[in-house]
C-alpha cells in the first residue's frame, strides 16, 4: 500500500534520516515533541521568504542544535549574522528558557529537485492566480532538466476556481512508491487562494540507493594504487648484420 503511507516515514532508517535526534524520559517526551513542533513553526513563519526546505533538531543536555536547509542562506544569516542572532533570541523567548541554541545554515544547491521548494513555488504561483496546468508543467520541466528520474504532483481543491472540488494528478517518469530503496523526496503544502485552500503533494524520485554500493565505491577510490613494474624492452642484437 505504497500510496497510503507517508513516503518519508516509510523509509526512515533506509534511505531517509530522522529529522529530530534526541532521547527523553517518557514523562518529558510529549513536552519535548511539542517544543520541536513550535520551533519548526516559528522558524517557518519568521523565514517565510527564505525558501526553507528542512529543519532538523538535535538535542544535547541543555543545548539545542538546529540545522536549517534553505535555498537562500543570505536571507537567513542576514548582514553580519544579524538574522541568526535575532532568530536565536526569538526561539529562546518562545521556549521560555536560556538554553544554548546553535543554528547551522545549509544551502540547498539543487532547488529544482527539492520537493518542499517545488511545492512552495507552485503554491506561490497558484496564489497569484496563474493557470494550474502551466505552473505544474513548468515545475516538472525544471525538475527533469535538473536530473530527477521521476516526479508526481497532485493538487486537490477548487482548481482554477471550479465550482466542484477535484483532484488533479500529473506524473512524468518513474515514481516507485513500493520500493524501499527508492530515494523519494515527499512534501505537502497548501495554497490559500480566493476560492479556498488547495492541497499540494509532491513526490520526487531521485534514483535508487543500494546499501553498500557507496561504501564499495569509496573503498576502491581510497585503495592505494600498486606500482606496476616496468618490463624491460627486448632489443634484437643486430650488430653482426651487414
Swiss-Prot record:
GO cellular component: cytosolic small ribosomal subunit
Ribonucleoprotein as UniProt keyword: yes
UniProt-listed SUPFAM superfamilies: Prokaryotic type KH domain (KH-domain type II), Ribosomal protein S3 C-terminal domain
A single MF term (Gene Ontology): structural constituent of ribosome
Single biological process term from Gene Ontology: translation
Region span, Disordered: 220-242
InterPro entries cross-referenced by the UniProt entry: KH_dom-like_a/b (IPR015946), KH_dom_type_2 (IPR004044), KH_sf_prok-type (IPR009019), Ribosomal_S3_C_sf (IPR036419), Ribosomal_uS3_bac-typ (IPR005704), Ribosomal_uS3_C (IPR001351), Ribosomal_uS3_CS (IPR018280)
Biased composition, class Basic and acidic residues, residue ranges: 233-242
Assigned keywords, A-Z: Ribonucleoprotein, Ribosomal protein, RNA-binding, rRNA-binding
Cross-referenced Gene3D superfamilies: 3.30.300.20, Ribosomal protein S3, C-terminal domain
Residue ranges with Basic residues bias: 223-232
Residue span(s) of domain KH type-2: 39-109
NCBIfam families: rpsC_bact
Subunit structure: Part of the 30S ribosomal subunit. Forms a tight complex with proteins S10 and S14.
Family: Belongs to the universal ribosomal protein uS3 family.
UniProt-listed HAMAP family: Ribosomal_uS3_B (MF_01309_B)
Protein's job: Binds the lower part of the 30S subunit head. Binds mRNA in the 70S ribosome, positioning it for translation.
Protein name as annotated: Small ribosomal subunit protein uS3
Annotated organism of origin: Trichodesmium erythraeum (strain IMS101)
Amino acid at each position: 500500500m505504497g500510496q497510503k503511507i507517508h513516503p518519508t516515514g516509510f523509509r526512515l532508517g533506509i534511505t531517509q534520516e530522522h529529522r529530530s535526534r534526541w532521547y527523553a524520559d517518557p514523562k518529558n517526551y510529549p513536552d519535548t515533541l511539542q517544543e520541536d513542533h513550535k520551533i519548526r513553526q516559528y522558524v517557518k513563519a519568521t523565514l517565510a521568504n527564505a525558501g526553507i526546505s528542512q529543519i532538523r533538531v538535535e538535542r544535547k543536555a541543555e543545548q539545542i542544535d538546529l540545522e536549517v536547509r534553505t535555498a537562500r542562506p543570505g536571507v537567513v544569516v542576514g548582514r553580519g549574522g544579524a538574522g541568526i542572532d535575532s532568530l536565536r533570541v526569538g526561539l529562546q523567548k518562545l521556549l521560555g528558557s536560556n538554553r544554548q541554541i546553535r543554528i547551522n545554515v545549509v544551502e540547498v544547491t539543487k532547488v529544482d529537485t527539492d520537493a518542499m521548494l517545488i511545492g512552495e513555488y507552485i503554491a506561490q504561483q497558484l496564489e497569484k492566480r496563474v493557470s494550474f496546468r502551466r505552473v505544474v508543467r513548468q515545475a516538472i520541466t525544471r525538475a527533469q532538466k535538473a536530473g530527477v528520474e521521476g516526479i508526481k504532483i497532485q493538487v486537490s481543491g477548487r482548481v482554477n476556481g471550479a465550482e466542484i472540488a477535484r483532484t488533479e494528478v500529473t506524473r512524468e517518469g518513474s515514481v516507485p512508491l513500493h520500493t524501499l530503496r527508492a530515494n523519494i523526496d515527499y512534501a505537502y503544502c497548501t495554497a490559500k487562494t480566493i476560492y479556498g485552500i488547495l492541497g499540494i503533494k509532491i513526490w520526487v524520485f531521485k534514483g535508487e540507493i543500494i546499501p553498500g554500493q557507496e561504501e564499495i565505491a569509496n573503498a576502491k577510490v581510497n585503495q592505494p594504487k600498486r606500482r606496476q613494474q616496468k618490463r624491460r624492452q627486448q632489443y634484437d642484437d643486430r650488430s653482426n648484420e651487414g
